């Protein structure tokens, strides 16, 4: 039985897993959700940005995800994503999406969700390091350090969004300092 002809889909822009968004995963989900909505003739789509777990992630950090959904909703492709994002924010989408770096450790597969090293490294108790098995300090320390540098560079050209990149640069610097302490 059909529930109703009047169905709305509520997708998500991943900002509820700590201090850092996951626009990369949101992109993957948006592509599949858009296909499913179109195949099932669902005309109304909303994108949510939940503030679970304390709402640490800034709302504007998911602008790439929102632009992806806009492109899919209005054009059904991402051909003009970069141009439209640059017009809307003044930054390239490629630069802006670097805001995800604290969650994108070298050993993590690209298509996983819910893995949030930005949070578990930050909150790891150095006297009781139960999460050490989830990190590889020899890879993760330089990753976080490089991420801090990259985000600091982007901050200089980010205009009104500079605070997002400054916050993430500082977070990555802390994570780089802490990841090998346990």
Positions of PLM-derived features:
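Substrate-binding groove of N-acetylhexosamine-processing glycoside hydrolases
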Residues: 1-182
